[in-house]
Amino acid sequence: MEVLRRSVSWHIRNAAVAMAIFILITIDVLHSGPLTEIDANIALWNRPELPDWADWIIYNLDHLGLRGLTALCLLTLAIYLGRRFKTWRPFNLSLLSLLALNLVVGLAKLEFGRTKPKLQIDLLDAGGMSYPSGHASNAILTWGLFAYLAVKYSAPSKFRTNLAIWSVSVVSILVVLISLFRNTHWLSDLVGGVSIGAALFFLIVAIDRVISSSRTINTPQVHSV
């Protein structure tokens, strides 16, 4: 019971830290702070021309942050785990994460209306959908929950847990770097997306820890995915 309490507390603290980072980035964006200057400099980089095959790879790797793909993968795993262990828990958590992501990130995009860097002008309330990045928030929340469920409903394995953590980290970083290379998002969009996605992930895991379930084989340790 004490381990569970510490786990919930740890996830809530991390959610608060991630949300604080998102708020700070948002303030910077709203007031054209130092981060927006970095945004402008990165947007002006000369991107190299890639051969068709390399451009195809980059384009498709960017889909790792696509809402439809990530949702399909997560729900497929959730349904499989639900049928195997006769529980609605994976599906309910997945549905909660997708609803939270679309509600929070979607409303934020509409509220800020930030233009994309490809327009070569950074404007708010201009009908844009750039901030925060849906690709970045999708990557860390949806793939994070995918990894969490895969580890939770499997036999205890430190290797599997570490592999899940590193996999989600690599995918999230890859999505950020590809977005910067393709100039589809400002850096602050991406950092904001990662932070709000992480905050939602930690909150959902905390909810899962608070509401007990008898169908779980393995609950990852406090500092797991």
How would you label these PLM feature ranges?
Residues 44, 93-98, 190-194:
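Alpha-helical transmembrane segments of multi-pass membrane proteins, especially transporters
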Residues 53-54, 86-91, 117-118, 157-163, ...:
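Membrane-helix interface segments
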Residues 1-69, 110-124:
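N-terminal transmembrane-helix/juxtamembrane module of multi-pass inner/ER membrane proteins
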Residues 10, 14, 75-103:
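Interfacial segments of alpha-helical transmembrane regions
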Residues 64-86, 144-146, 150:
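Hydrophobic alpha-helical transmembrane segments
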Residues 22-25, 99-104, 170-180:
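Aromatic-anchored segments of alpha-helical transmembrane domains
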Residues 91-121, 181-186:
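Hydrophobic alpha-helical transmembrane segments of integral membrane proteins
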